[in-house]
């Protein structure tokens, strides 16, 4: 019974995280018209294309919303401040899975190992 509850919680956490990211883009302006939806749908079609998305651990500084999907969830662009040899700092971003997704996948592998 405990295993079933843990699996259900992990599934809900991963599902809510993957669905919340697309809803955030869509619900920014609640009073939208059909003219506003068409560019949004066109942009989503481009993002779904595997050839145009940014793979894991690749640079996404200039295009933060175009990370590829990994399984059921979409990776996020994470930014870091990097200092070079001269001491000048710059911001670098790379596509990576969120911490919640990493915990979910680790838990899933542990549960699979039990069976």
Swiss-Prot record:
Disulfide bonds: 53-68, 60-77, 67-95, 79-93
Keywords: Calcium channel impairing toxin, Disulfide bond, Ion channel impairing toxin, Knottin, Membrane, Neurotoxin, Secreted, Signal, Target cell membrane, Target membrane, Toxin, Voltage-gated calcium channel impairing toxin
Coiled-coil residue windows: none
Major localization listed first in the record, in broad terms: secreted
Cell compartment(s), UniProt: Secreted; Target cell membrane
Expressed in which tissues: Expressed by the venom gland.
Keyword Secreted: yes
Annotated signal peptide: 1-20
GO molecular function: calcium channel regulator activity; toxin activity
GO CC terms: extracellular region; membrane; other organism cell membrane
PROSITE patterns tied to this protein: SPIDER_CSTX
Proregion positions: 21-47
InterPro entries documented for this protein: Spider_toxin_CSTX_knottin (IPR019553), Spider_toxin_CSTX_Knottin_CS (IPR011142)
Family per similarity comment: Belongs to the neurotoxin 19 (CSTX) family.
Note on domains (UniProt): The presence of a 'disulfide through disulfide knot' structurally defines this protein as a knottin.
Assembly behavior: Monomer. Interacts with CSTX-13 (AC P83919) (Kd=370 nM), but does not interact with CSTX-1 (AC P81694).
Protein name: Toxin CSTX-9
């Amino acid at each position: 019974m405990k295993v079933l509850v843990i699996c259900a919680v992990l599934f809900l956490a991963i599902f809510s995280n993957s669905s919340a990211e697309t809803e955030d883009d869509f619900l920014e302006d609640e009073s939208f018209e059909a003219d506003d939806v068409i560019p949004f749908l066109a942009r989503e079609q481009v993002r779904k294309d595997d050839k145009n998305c940014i793979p894991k651990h690749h640079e996404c500084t200039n295009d933060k919303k175009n990370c590829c999907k990994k399984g059921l969830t979409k990776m996020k662009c994470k930014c870091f401040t990097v200092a070079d040899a001269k001491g000048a700092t710059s911001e670098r971003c790379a596509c990576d899975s969120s911490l919640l997704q990493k915990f979910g996948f680790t838990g899933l592998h542990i549960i699979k190992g039990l069976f």
